[in-house]
Amino acid sequence: LVGSEMCIRDRYMNEITSMWDSHWLTNMGPKHKELQANLCDYLGVDNIDLLTNGHMALELTLQAMNLQGEVITTPFTFASTTHAIVRNGLTPVFCDIDPDTYCMDASKIEKLITDRTCAIMPVHVYGNVCNIEEIERIAHKYELKVIYDAAHTFGETYKGKGIGSFGDASCFSFHATKVFNSIEGGAVCYKDK
């Protein structure tokens, strides 16, 4: 059996004390800005915003894009992926998965595209990266947005680039069950401000 170990108490208390002493606990305070800058460097991205959780990263990204219609996604994911789509008044259209990677089978996307399709929301699963080149080729061909659910691939790279640098946006979860966690939290990396 392997036990988990909490961070060193004194170090943790120093971090908490410095936040308390600054009188700035949230909303772009010094620790927030420091984490954002460190994550940009670590993930190899230009833009990142921190949010309360991965679900809000997905939901607010879709809302910011002001999309209408259908979003092609996968049913092989946590419910938040589909919930974010539905909560934005969009219709999820499910694409089957590749049996080897458990990621969306890119070869099945085009036959699901209709005149109502506005975006593709692939999910990188269990550290497996989606077929980025094919997904982005299809998105470019049909002028669709691509929002990656990257909750399972924090810190991964693809062809030397951070996984958060692909698509129009990539969303991460920092839930306690994820590779990198802050007990709760999330982030969205994006190209255009």
Predicted features and spans:
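Short, small-residue-biased leader/transition segments that mark boundaries at the very start
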Residues: 1-8
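Structured loop/turn residues at beta-strand edges in well-structured enzyme cores
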Residues: 2, 43, 66, 115, ...
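Phosphate-binding glycine-rich loop
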Residues: 28-70, 76, 83-88, 94-96, ...
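PLP-dependent aminotransferase-like
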Residues: 63-150, 157
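Conserved active-site segment immediately N-terminal to the catalytic lysine
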Residues: 148-182
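Short beta-strand-to-turn element immediately C-terminal to the catalytic PLP-Schiff-base lysine
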Residues: 172-173, 187-192
